[in-house]
Amino acid sequence: MPNKLLSANATVPQWDRHNLVPRIVHLGFGAFHRAHQAVYADVLAAEHSSDWGYIEVNLIGGEQQIADLKCQDFLYTVAEMSASAWSGRVVGVVRQALHAQVDGTEAVLEALCQPQVAIVSLTITEKGYCHAPATGELMRDHPLIVADLAQPHQPHSAPGIIVEALARRRAAGLAAFSVMSCDNIPENGRVIAGVVCAYARQCD
């Protein structure tokens, strides 16, 4: 990206992006993640030589976001504006981008099974957890869950994909990754733990 196309108020990566290791797979490449989590990782890379990079994944919807990211060498810009000023940051910590319905679920599972992946973070909205909000329990009659339980090695739901990836890692002798829900829902950690464990028990 020629710097002459950017405002002097824009911050661009001055560090070697090739040194990044994709240690985090993020499910749900939405605005909150783009403007906050990925920016924090970008600051760490710029100011503290962090090598933690992202693999961005959309499971359902957002096909154009992933397509655009691929066309832009996995770079995108976050703009901050006030009444008197504008600044931008070109975020450079993304190393790969996938869409489950475009690239295939198998490509997503392969990314999750890369040995260096340590964290799977999620901003998939409340609906993505396939749970009953009133109880926090997995909805076993949810269409995605029903389909995944019928074909557990070809999952489409977030719980199904996480469980299948963990099973493959265990079979390959790889350490499990940490699952980190970042959605704005009550007790998000308990919710993701509950639906993942409940789904895994159904698979057994």
Curated annotation (Swiss-Prot):
Binding site for NAD(+): I24, V25, H26, L27, G28, F29, G30, A31, F32, H33, R34, A35
Keyword Cytoplasm: no
EC number, as in UniProt: 1.-.-.-
InterPro entries: Mannitol_DH (IPR000669), Mannitol_DH/Oxidoreductase (IPR050988), Mannitol_DH_N (IPR013131), NAD(P)-bd_dom_sf (IPR036291)
Keywords: NAD, Oxidoreductase
Family affiliation: Belongs to the mannitol dehydrogenase family.
Name the record gives this protein: Uncharacterized oxidoreductase in tutB 3'region
